[in-house]
């Protein structure tokens, strides 16, 4: 959530920044007018209350003097009626301002490339060289079916489109991947957490999914509960409405969880395979940091995600997202895109973002600065470390052999009971 004080004091700069995220200037101008009206009403209310207090004191004095107070009582009643009417108007204005501040996206950092969409993203670096095959590489969905480890047909029968069963060494591979990821993040100082997979609406508001993106989630009807779209939600809200000790920052959390997404608006996109599912496993990284340290922590988090891909020897690139392509809560985002041979393309496998104090303001997560004793909003960061299903897809395609088998990456073999190859 944006700081209304920053919008007031630096309106032109904020408007210019948000314009790069597709926010119409008319929206901010309307918000500015409503905010000015609110402040004028507050002044009127305070003036009327002061007058009412004066009249009240005059009534008390008149009664002590046994004087007639009818006119003064009538005047006080009129003042009270005016205050009540203005308070009602103020409540309506506050609701409107809240609607603005909770649905406007975060302000992009100065270092973020300016652009309307993915076409303006900037590649930062690449790692690894895509393998040259001496045969036509298969898509991971065909490999998975031929190996008998991925079953979309029965997933569709049991549930519907974009669901599947992992079987045998496919299930073992999925489990090996996320255990490997959690172990690697643990070495980097992350505390492993098992979170609730259902959260309440306040938690969804805290991280920015609600109210703007309700259509992308699976709500439990007639309840206050939602299936989590990412472990970012419960991990970040772990400290909601709390004041942390500054000397304990930064704090690192990691968790593996299922993620549930309706994929509204994704009709026709990635209809086959593991790239876009309604339910998938993901290992998440979340950080709580002091403002002056958060961008250094973003670089470290991105490196933590890269470490997984490097140890799996999967070629990838790091991309800085443009202002128009970033997520709602982010001030800066790096995407990691892994090489998918059958698509001859890099595909997203991780997003690492700094939200600065955007989520912390919504969730009221603060810290007491040990330097001056003041309570301040901290910065929150989140990143995929990594999307597990997409990692399965990348391994199947990059490690496939001409006979249809798939070699298991060396880093995963201790997690696979010593298995080295998945054979038809």
UniProtKB/Swiss-Prot annotation:
This protein's pathway: Aminoacyl-tRNA biosynthesis; selenocysteinyl-tRNA(Sec) biosynthesis; L-seryl-tRNA(Sec) from L-serine and tRNA(Sec): step 1/1
One GO molecular-function entry: transferase activity
Keyword annotations of the record: Aminoacyl-tRNA synthetase, ATP-binding, Cytoplasm, Ligase, Nucleotide-binding, Protein biosynthesis
SUPFAM superfamilies per UniProt: Class II aaRS and biotin synthetases, tRNA-binding arm
Subcellular compartments: Cytoplasm
GO BP field: selenocysteine biosynthetic process; seryl-tRNA aminoacylation
Annotated ATP binding sites: 261-263, 348-351
Residues annotated for L-serine binding in this entry: 230-232, 284, 384
Pfam families in alphabetical order: Seryl_tRNA_N (PF02403), tRNA-synt_2b (PF00587)
EC number annotated for this UniProt entry: 6.1.1.11
Broad class of where this protein is predominantly found: cytoplasm
Superkingdom of the organism of origin: Bacteria
Reactions catalysed: tRNA(Ser) + L-serine + ATP = L-seryl-tRNA(Ser) + AMP + diphosphate + H(+); tRNA(Sec) + L-serine + ATP = L-seryl-tRNA(Sec) + AMP + diphosphate + H(+)
GO CC term (a single one): cytoplasm
Annotated HAMAP family: Ser_tRNA_synth_type1 (MF_00176)
Domain comment as written in the entry: Consists of two distinct domains, a catalytic core and a N-terminal extension that is involved in tRNA binding.
Family classification: Belongs to the class-II aminoacyl-tRNA synthetase family. Type-1 seryl-tRNA synthetase subfamily.
Subunit structure: Homodimer. The tRNA molecule binds across the dimer.
The protein's role, per its UniProt record: Catalyzes the attachment of serine to tRNA(Ser). Is also able to aminoacylate tRNA(Sec) with serine, to form the misacylated tRNA L-seryl-tRNA(Sec), which will be further converted into selenocysteinyl-tRNA(Sec).
Protein name as annotated: Serine--tRNA ligase
């Amino acid at each position: 959530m944006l700081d209304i004080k920053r919008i007031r004091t630096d309106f032109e700069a904020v408007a210019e920044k948000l314009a790069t995220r597709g926010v119409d200037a008319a929206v901010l101008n309307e918000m500015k007018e409503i905010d000015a009206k609110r402040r004028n009403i507050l002044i009127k209310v305070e003036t009327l209350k002061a007058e009412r207090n004066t009249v009240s004191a005059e009534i008390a004095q008149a009664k002590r003097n046994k004087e007639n107070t009818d006119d003064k009582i009538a005047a006080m009643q009129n003042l009270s009626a005016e205050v009540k009417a203005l308070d009602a108007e103020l409540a309506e204005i506050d609701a409107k301002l809240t609607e603005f501040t909770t649905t406007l996206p975060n302000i992009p950092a100065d270092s973020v490339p300016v652009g309307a969409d993915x076409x303006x993203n900037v590649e930062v670096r690449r790692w690894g060289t895509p393998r040259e095959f001496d045969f036509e590489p298969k898509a991971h969905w065909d490999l998975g079916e031929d190996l008998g480890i991925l079953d979309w047909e029965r997933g569709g029968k049991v549930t519907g489109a974009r669901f599947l069963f992992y079987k045998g060494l496919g299930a073992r591979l999925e489990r090996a991947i996320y255990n490997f990821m959690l172990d690697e993040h643990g070495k980097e100082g992350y505390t492993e957490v098992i979170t609730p997979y259902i959260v309440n609406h306040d938690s969804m508001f805290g991280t920015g999914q609600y109210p703007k993106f309700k259509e992308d989630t699976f709500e439990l009807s007639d309840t206050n509960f939602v299936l989590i779209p990412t472990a970012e939600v419960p991990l970040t809200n772990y400290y909601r409405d709390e004041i942390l000790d500054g000397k304990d920052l930064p704090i690192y959390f990691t968790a593996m969880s299922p993620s549930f997404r309706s994929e509204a608006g994704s009709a026709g996109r990635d209809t086959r395979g593991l790239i876009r599912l309604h339910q998938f496993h993901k290992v998440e990284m979340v950080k709580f940091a002091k403002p002056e340290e958060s961008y250094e922590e973003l670089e470290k988090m991105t490196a933590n995600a890269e470490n997984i891909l490097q140890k799996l020897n999967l070629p990838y690139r790091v991309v800085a997202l443009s202002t128009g392509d970033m997520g709602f809560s982010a001030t800066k985002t790096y995407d990691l895109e892994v090489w998918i041979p059958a698509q001859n393309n890099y595909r997203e496998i991780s997003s690492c973002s700094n939200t600065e104090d955007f989520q912390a303001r919504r969730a009221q997560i603060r810290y007491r600065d040990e330097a001056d004793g003041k309570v301040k909003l901290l910065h929150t960061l989140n990143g995929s470390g990594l999307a597990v299903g997409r990692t399965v897809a990348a391994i199947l395609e990059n490690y496939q052999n001409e006979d249809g088998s798939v070699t298991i990456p060396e880093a995963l073999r201790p997690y696979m009971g010593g298995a080295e190859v998945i054979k038809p």
